[in-house]
């Protein structure tokens, strides 16, 4: 008895059911919108551009010319522990992030690229406050931000070919502590959630 919905062989349902069964939890340290995605499979009305900084930032990117479509080409999902570890190792293997001077603009470009190609909502790449080493809040992300030695900053700014807009020339203007930071890979961060130990207050709602 029953119509088309009584059959488990409805086109694609077994695949969807299996995907739901295997859905990984969001990694510790992701933002509120990613928690929504984990819990409800979508971003709810409690996280809008008016109430959530990551949602507002993403909406603003849609109005800017960023070089690639902002709408993801894959389903929207929260960053998971496994995905953060895999992404860290992928970027280490491909090169380009290790030792790169951090700026908010560069982080935005990385977040948008990952959002566009992988569908991970861009509220996962957050770090502990400074001064000193900034550890990732998202467990599994193996890149920390490390202050660059002042003499290396000075050395990088010598000569006439220095770009005044290069992040190293901005002398930490992006950073509340005025430190020049660089991304540094640390495989131990896949096993040791340093941010949670240093700042348990950030994880009360996790």
From Swiss-Prot:
Induction (record text): Expressed early in the viral replication cycle.
Pfam families: F-protein
Entry annotated with the keyword Cell inner membrane: no
Residue segments, region Mediates dimerization, Nef-PTE1 interaction: 108-124
Positions of the UniProt region annotated as Acidic: 62-65
Post-translational modification: The virion-associated Nef proteins are cleaved by the viral protease to release the soluble C-terminal core protein. Nef is probably cleaved concomitantly with viral structural proteins on maturation of virus particles.
Gene3D superfamilies tied to this protein: HIV 1 nef anchor domain (4.10.890.10), Nef Regulatory Factor (3.30.62.10)
Motif Dileucine internalization motif, residue range(s) on this chain: 164-165
Topology class, membrane: Lipid-anchor
Variant or mutagenesis effect after changing residue 15 to A: In strain: Clone pNL4-3
Cellular localisation: Host cell membrane; Virion; Secreted; Host Golgi apparatus membrane
Protein's recorded name: Protein Nef
Organism listed in the record: Human immunodeficiency virus type 1 group M subtype B (isolate BRU/LAI) (HIV-1)
């Amino acid at each position: 008895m029953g119509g088309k919905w009584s059959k488990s062989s409805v086109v694609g349902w077994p695949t969807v059911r299996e995907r739901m069964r295997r859905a990984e939890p969001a990694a510790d340290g992701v933002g509120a919108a990613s928690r929504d995605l984990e819990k409800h499979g979508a971003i709810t009305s409690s996280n809008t551009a008016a109430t959530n900084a990551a949602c507002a930032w993403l909406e603003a990117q849609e109005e800017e010319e960023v070089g690639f479509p902002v709408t993801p080409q894959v389903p929207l999902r929260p960053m998971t522990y496994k995905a953060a570890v895999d992404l860290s190792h992928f970027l280490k293997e491909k090169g380009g992030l290790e030792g790169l001077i951090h700026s908010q603009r560069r982080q935005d470009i990385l977040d948008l690229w990952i959002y566009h190609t992988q569908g991970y909502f861009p509220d996962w790449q957050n770090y502990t406050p400074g001064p000193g080493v900034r550890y990732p809040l998202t467990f599994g992300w193996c890149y920390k931000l490390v202050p660059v030695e002042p003499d290396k900053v000075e050395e990088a700014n010598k000569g006439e070919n220095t770009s005044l807009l290069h992040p190293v020339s901005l002398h930490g203007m992006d950073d509340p502590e005025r430190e020049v930071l660089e991304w540094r890979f640390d495989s131990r961060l896949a096993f040791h959630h340093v941010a949670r130990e240093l700042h348990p207050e950030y994880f009360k709602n996790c």
